[in-house]
């Protein structure tokens, strides 16, 4: 796999001087002969669009050089749309249209807010005057798929220029920009990588300052990551590979995922930014071993980077364990790669993963929250519910709920709140808004709801307290049943 842009050139052989204006390179004649050739070709047998169209362009523009670049690696219009260049469509007079577009419907990612989607134009054939860094180019975008099959796509840019060096720089700049992340995360799923902006947005909502953890452990986690990415030269001086691996383990629902997201946010804010490579599954038509190969190649390409394997016990099964260990600690260099793995079941991991320091150097245990942490979590819900005047939630209620949720994970406490609020909403004419679970680890330190509770009788008058006790009882019975099973 290579990150270079697949471009090939036709250079002038006639020794003529470069033309000062792009239009001077075209031969005289009615309309655009290259456009006519494309449409003539598209209505006949299609064998190789590239050869037909490049021949037509060389005939029409004998004084210009030609570069052909694949759209999938060098999307010039997208690069311009991001503000790095400008372009205008060129409309030629003639018997055939100057361009061919297909109007496509783009459905919304979410319909909950009433979004109906939007329309967009897919260019099948287009001709443009393209301007970049003071240079002008005539470019054609051509969908040259040969035959009736939908795959593979053959969408190419044909770049005509009087300055071949500048055109090559444009292709390089566009390809480099296109391969980078732009407020996105690399996510591997179903056998391939995609840039995921939604995961990036989710991580941006998480910060270490707002995560409820033991303060000493939180400081260790933060320093472990920062010190690694700032210690490249130290590792080199010591003669050891610049790589590191951590395992987060413990009961589900106690902050492993939100800690990973907070780290993603922290690393994205660094200068230069540290990208994240996130593994969602190893399922692939080529098999899980091939998936691991592709994943680690991507991590090496973007190193220094943060490589995430959540629920590693379900990802790295016995069938791929040997291959995984070889990628982590084999002959290939993994300099700059910080691997983070999480699991709810450390005992299910092979000792070669969980007990080999050169692969995963340290393990961090995420236990059920203690009384202080549970009370802090209740203050989060107190703040979320503050705008709802129908829910009475004084400070004393936070402590009371924390005391009856011993051995509960954050996720179980969250479920108790959600179930209680839904029950109250079902009896209320004005339903309270269900708080977002994405923020359910936030530590609230201010804006507490005022009001004092004098005794237990006053507490029992609070609808939220009465309902949440019911839900805690139900959840605890379920926990006991699971333990007996």
Can you annotate each of these PLM segments?
Residues 174, 260-263, 295, 401, ...:
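Aromatic/hydrophobic pocket-lining residues that form π-stacking "cages" and hydrophobic walls in ligand
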Residues 166-170, 217, 320, 374, ...:
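Alpha-helical interaction elements in eukaryotic regulators
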Residues 158, 203-208, 362-363, 398-404:
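Short interface patches used for recognition in eukaryotic signaling and trafficking proteins
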Residues 2-230, 243, 485:
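AAA+ P-loop ATPase mechanoenzymes
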Residues 61, 65, 178, 182, ...:
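Eukaryotic basic, amphipathic alpha-helical target segments in cytosolic regions
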Residues 208-395:
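Walker A/P-loop NTP-binding motif of AAA+ ATPase domains
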Residues 356, 367, 371-485:
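C-terminal alpha-helical "lid" subdomain
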């Amino acid at each position: 796999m290579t990150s270079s842009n697949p471009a090939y050139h036709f250079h002038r052989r006639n020794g003529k001087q470069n033309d000062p204006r792009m239009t001077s390179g075209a031969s005289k004649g009615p309309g655009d002969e290259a456009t006519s050739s494309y449409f003539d070709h598209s209505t006949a047998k299609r064998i190789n669009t590239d050869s037909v169209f490049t021949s037509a362009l060389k005939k029409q523009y004998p004084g210009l050089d030609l570069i052909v670049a694949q759209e999938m690696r060098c999307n010039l219009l997208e690069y311009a749309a991001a503000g790095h260049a400008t372009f205008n469509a060129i409309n030629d007079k003639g018997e055939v249209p100057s361009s061919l577009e297909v109007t496509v419907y783009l459905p919304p990612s979410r319909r909950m807010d009433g979004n109906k989607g939007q329309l967009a134009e897919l260019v099948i054939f287009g001709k443009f005057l393209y301007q970049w860094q003071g240079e002008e180019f005539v470019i054609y975008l051509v969908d040259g798929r040969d035959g009736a099959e939908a795959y593979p796509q053959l969408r190419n840019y044909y770049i005509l220029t009087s300055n071949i060096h500048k055109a090559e720089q444009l292709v390089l700049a566009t390809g480099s920009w296109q391969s980078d992340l732009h407020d996105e995360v690399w996510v591997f799923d179903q056998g391939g990588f995609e840039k995921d902006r939604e995961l990036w947005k989710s991580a941006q909502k998480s910060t270490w300052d707002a995560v409820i953890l033991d303060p000493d452990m939180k400081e260790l986690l933060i320093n472990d990551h920062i010190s690694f990415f700032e210690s490249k030269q130290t590792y080199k001086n010591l003669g050891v590979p610049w790589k590191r691996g951590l395992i987060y383990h413990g009961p589900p629902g106690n902050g492993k995922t939100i800690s990973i997201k907070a780290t993603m946010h922290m690393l994205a804010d660094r200068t230069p930014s540290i990208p994240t490579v996130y593994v969602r599954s190893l399922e692939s038509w080529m098999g899980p071993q091939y998936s691991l190969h592709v994943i680690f190649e991507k991590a090496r390409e973007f190193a220094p980077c943060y490589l995430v394997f959540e629920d590693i016990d379900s990802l790295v099964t016995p069938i791929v364990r040997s291959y995984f260990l070889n990628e982590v600690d084999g002959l290939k260099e993994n300099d700059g790669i910080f691997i983070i793995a999480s699991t709810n079941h450390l005992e299910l991991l092979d000792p070669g993963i969980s007990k080999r320091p050169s692969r995963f150097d340290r393990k961090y245990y995420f236990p059920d929250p203690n009384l202080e942490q549970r009370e802090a979590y209740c203050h989060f819900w107190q703040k979320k519910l503050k705008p709802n005047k129908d829910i009475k939630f004084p400070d004393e209620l936070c402590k009371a709920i924390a005391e009856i949720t011993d051995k509960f994970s954050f996720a179980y406490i969250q479920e108790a709140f959600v179930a209680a609020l839904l029950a109250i909403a079902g009896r209320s004419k004005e339903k309270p808004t269900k708080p977002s679970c994405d923020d359910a680890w936030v530590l609230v330190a201010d804006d507490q709801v005022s009001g004092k509770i004098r005794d237990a009788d006053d507490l029992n008058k609070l609808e939220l307290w009465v309902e949440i006790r019911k839900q805690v009882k139900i959840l605890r019975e379920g926990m006991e049943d699971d333990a007996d099973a």
